[in-house]
C-alpha cells in the first residue's frame, strides 16, 4: 500500500512507535511533518527517515508540546503550510506513570491525561478544522491501548486515559464522518517500545516477573509482543491509505490476540 502524495502529521515521533511510523510513512512515499518535545530524538528520527534507501517521501521535525493548545495550533499551521495541505493525522504521542492506584496524586493525573487525552483532543480538533474547511475527506488515527479495555496492574491512570481516548474516538467517528466524511479510528498496539521497557524497569518487580512468565499464554502469535516495523507499521500505512476509506470508528488491536485470550 503506497502513500505517494499523502500529507501526514505524526505526534510523538522522537522515539518508539511514532518514530517507526514516521520512517514507514516516508518509505511509502508520504510527506510527513512530526513533533515531539524530545528534540534530540526528533532530529534523529528525521535524519533516519530521510536517509532510508529508496524512500520517496520526506520527514520534517518540529518541537511541539501537545498538552499546550496554542502550541498545537501553531504547529499545525506550520506543518500545513510546509506540506501544502493535510490528509492524515497519526496521533501517537503518549506517556505513563505507574504506582498503586491509592498513591496517585493530582500531578500524575495532570501529566498523563495532559498528553494522552488532552493532546488527543487538541490535535484532533486542529486536523478536523482543516479537513472541514477545505473539503478534505481525511483520516485521524489515534493511539489508545488494550489497557483501556482490560486495565493494567499499577497503571490505573494510564489505562483510564486510554479508555478516554477510545470513547472520544468513537464519538468523533460518528460526528465527523456524518458532517465531513472524515474517518477516525484507534489503534491499540502491543508492541515493544521504550514505554514498555520503562514499565519493566519501574513497575513492582513481582508484577513484572509474573507478567514475563505469562507472555506465552497472553500472546498466541509468537508468545511475545510484536515489532514496530514488521507488525505495526503496515497497519498504520493501510489506515492512512485510500484503501481504508470505509473503516471508521474502529479499534484495531495489533496485539497477536492478547485481548481475545483475556
Where are these regions (language model features)?
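C-terminal helical subdomain
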Residues: 186, 207-247, 254-256
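Short, small/polar-rich loop/turn modules that mediate ligand/substrate recognition or access, typified
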Residues: 177-183, 247-249
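Active-site helix of classical SDR
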Residues: 124, 161, 169
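Canonical Rossmann dinucleotide-binding motif of NAD(H)/NADP(H)-dependent dehydrogenases/reductases
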Residues: 3-33
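Short C-terminal tail/terminal secondary-structure segment
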Residues: 2, 150, 237, 248-262
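Residue(s) in the substrate-gating loop at a strand-loop-helix junction
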Residues: 145
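Substrate-binding pocket helix/loop in short-chain dehydrogenase/reductase
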Residues: 100-101, 105-113, 204, 215
Amino acid at each position: 500500500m503506497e502513500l505517494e502524495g499523502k500529507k501526514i502529521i505524526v505526534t510523538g515521533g522522537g522515539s518508539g512507535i511514532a518514530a517507526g511510523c514516521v520512517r514507514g510513512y516516508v518509505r511509502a512515499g508520504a510527506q510527513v511533518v512530526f513533533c515531539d518535545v524530545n528534540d534530540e530524538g526528533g532530529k534523529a528520527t528525521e535524519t533516519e527517515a530521510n536517509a532510508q534507501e529508496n524512500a520517496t517521501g520526506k520527514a520534517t521535525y518540529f518541537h511541539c508540546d501537545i498538552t499546550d493548545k496554542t502550541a498545537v495550533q501553531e504547529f499545525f499551521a506550520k506543518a500545513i503550510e510546509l506540506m501544502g495541505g493535510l490528509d492524515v493525522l497519526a496521533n501517537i504521542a503518549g506517556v505513563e506513570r505507574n504506582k498503586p492506584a491509592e498513591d496517585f496524586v493530582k500531578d500524575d493525573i495532570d501529566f498523563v491525561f495532559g498528553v494522552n487525552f488532552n493532546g488527543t483532543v487538541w490535535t484532533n480538533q486542529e486536523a478536523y478544522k482543516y479537513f472541514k474547511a477545505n473539503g478534505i475527506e481525511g483520516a485521524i488515527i489515534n493511539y489508545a491501548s488494550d489497557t483501556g479495555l482490560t486495565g493494567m496492574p499499577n497503571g490505573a491512570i494510564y489505562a483510564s486515559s486510554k479508555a478516554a481516548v477510545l470513547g472520544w474516538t468513537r464519538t468523533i467517528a460518528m460526528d465527523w464522518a456524518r458532517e465531513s466524511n472524515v474517518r477516525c479510528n484507534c489503534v491499540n498496539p502491543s508492541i515493544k517500545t521504550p514505554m514498555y521497557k520503562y514499565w519493566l524497569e519501574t513497575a513492582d518487580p513481582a508484577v513484572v516477573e509474573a507478567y514475563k512468565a505469562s507472555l506465552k499464554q497472553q500472546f498466541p502469535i509468537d508468545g511475545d509482543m510484536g515489532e514496530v516495523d514488521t507488525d505495526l507499521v503496515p497497519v498504520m500505512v493501510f489506515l492512512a491509505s485510500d484503501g481504508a476509506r470505509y473503516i471508521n470508528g474502529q479499534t484495531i488491536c495489533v496485539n497477536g490476540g492478547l485481548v481475545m485470550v483475556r
